[in-house]
């Protein structure tokens, strides 16, 4: 017992030393940047003071009216203790930098838009969880032409036609969305038509090629190497989305169907040859002080895919999967505007590997931070093989500050499939069905409104029977993750 205690103490000291060095570095860097920002006119005002004008680079450069320049730079330090992924280091860390630079040239109803992304990670090592979700250095994120037409199909309506490389935010963003928390952002190349009626109804039609992040090998990612991202016709995405306001109990209704077609590229990559069709609907009423709100989404998925990416695997499996989200909340009309909501997510898992069916839900290109916690080197939860009820309490003390705490209990839908995004599975189904509890919190503060924002968050995953007993479990104990970042908008 004493040997075990001493070993645990030594491990704790080593972890503390690693954390201390990194956090001292990060806090020092944040202090320097904050001091410099104050000297450049970013000085924070008291909450009660009048709203200050945000700093904007195009105002500084006095660009002509037709040209708009903007950007963002984010510095984030992340630490993960007790890694849940098998074969990776027990403790992980990353200093992530993300810079976005955007230029818009507007000539009447025509806009030309270009946006660059530079995402890098430091303090990572060979067994880090670094991936293309963290690193994508010096890349054209967006480059498109947008044309607007007024009074199309109704007076007061608008129609935007966008062609080129672009990011997409569709509906709830659970299936297709522009990443916010993640260090890299998914882009698409193609055509997108967006019609909006005078009554706030919407219709979207799009056909695009998802952009693949390059390079993707571990050595290149660890060295932050650059390569031009690519898209090709071996991976295609299309969709139809319609939104109608005031459809149900004062809330809006959304209806959609998305299609994804994927083929092998003999020279580049082998795939599961997915041919997926994902129809669904959503009912939503946004939070409002002194009122109830809700968010209900139901999605089916069918088509074909293969069990593996192996060249020898030529058998198509019949896909039938599904995902469901339920959220009911209430916001009190009192100081701090506290909101308490009940959340429930269900995403199907693989029922068997010995039949001709595939049942694990594919979340396509949907961000997961809003429901399932921080991603990056963390991100144990996702919309795959999960049954997850939870509670969330959020508050906004003032115009500069907001935060929340949340709890989720997480079960496997299928005991023989891997749990959510953990990478841990038990084909025998003998390790149980309870994945564990996740407790998470976050606070954000505008040091200067719409210019400098501070953010800190933490998540603790208390392992259940499955992650303790599964043969492939990492066995490092309860994962603990925390991060802090500073974001400059200009």
Where are these regions (language model features)?
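N-terminal secretory signal peptides that target proteins for export/translocation
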Residues: 1-21
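Structural signature of outer-membrane beta-barrel domains
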Residues: 76-80, 112-115, 119-123, 166-170, ...
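Surface-exposed loop and membrane-interface regions of Gram-negative outer-membrane beta-barrel proteins
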Residues: 83-97, 107-161, 174-177, 223-227, ...
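Flexible internal linker/loop segments at domain or repeat junctions
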Residues: 359-383, 414-429
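Predominantly the C-terminal beta-signal and adjacent terminal strand-loop region
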Residues: 447-489
